A protein has these predicted regions:
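Conserved class I S-adenosyl-L-methionine
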Residues: 1-45, 59-60, 82, 86, ...
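Short glycine-dipeptide loop
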Residues: 47, 137-143
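A short glycine-rich, Lys/Arg-flanked "PGG" loop and its adjoining helix->strand segment in the class I
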Residues: 127-139
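Class I SAM-dependent methyltransferase SAM/SAH-binding core
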Residues: 49-103
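C-terminal alpha-helical "lid/dimerization" subdomain adjacent to the S-adenosyl-L-methionine
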Residues: 4-12, 27, 144-203
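A short SAM/SAH-binding and catalytic strip from SAM-dependent methyltransferases
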Residues: 113-125
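A short acidic, Gly/Pro-enriched loop at the edge of an enzyme's catalytic core
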Residues: 102-114
């Protein structure tokens, strides 16, 4: 096993995000503007089947229209509990369940829109996750990605290489390249724009 590989496993994700769940919203809300912008780009229609992978505490729910069907999934039951609690006020048409984003319990071509916010830099294998998304998406379906990636066209700095074991321990990998990930799938990149922290976070929209 590679050094620090344990920090990129579902087991470790369950441990740390169970611990973070009670206070996650304190920091999570700093990305509200980008979450909203990303979801608006999907153009969710009435009756759409919307899947959130890595829903966390449900911070995306308030930006999703009332008249669609939402399934929120997360690897930890503590996060799902927070999502359900939040929805008692938001009153979205919501089903929430514990699920691994690398193994989706959905039939082929059954989902209209997928939201992947701050998950591709955390999930052990982002390529497997996107391939699963591609499988369950209906033809023409879209994916909203908001996450931290190495900025397009830049090489890894020494500082990022040094910091990554620490960030990977605490919350996520900061050295993943979206271009490398997307090169292994057949989804079309419709848009890719810089977002928070000087473009280290990006808002990306994919289509099947």
């Amino acid at each position: 096993m590679k050094p620090f590989a344990i920090f990129s496993t579902n087991r470790w994700n369950r441990i740390r995000y169970t611990l973070y769940a009670p206070g996650y919203d304190i920091l999570g809300r700093i990305f509200s503007k980008s979450r909203s912008r990303s979801i608006q780009g999907l153009g969710i229609c009435p009756g759409d089947e919307v899947l959130i992978i890595g829903a966390g505490t449900g911070l995306d729910l308030e930006f999703i229209p009332m008249n669609c069907h939402i399934t929120a999934t997360d690897i930890t039951s503590a996060m799902i509990a927070q999502t359900m609690r939040k929805n008692t006020l938001l009153k979205r048409n919501l089903k929430a369940e514990v699920m691994d984003g690398q193994h989706l319990n959905f039939p082929d071509s059954s989902v209209d829109k997928i939201i992947l916010h701050l998950i591709l830099a955390v999930i052990p294998d982002p390529v497997v996750c996107l391939k699963e998304c591609e499988r369950v998406l209906k033809p023409g379906g879209q994916i909203a990605v908001f996450d931290k990636f190495v900025p397009k066209g830049r090489t890894l700095s020494l500082l990022r290489k040094i910091l990554n074991p620490i960030t990977n321990l605490l919350f996520s990998n900061i050295n993943r390249s979206f271009e490398t990930i997307v090169s292994e799938i057949s989804l079309l990149t419709e848009s890719d724009v810089p977002a928070d922290f000087n473009g280290n976070f990006r808002i990306i929209r994919l289509r099947k």
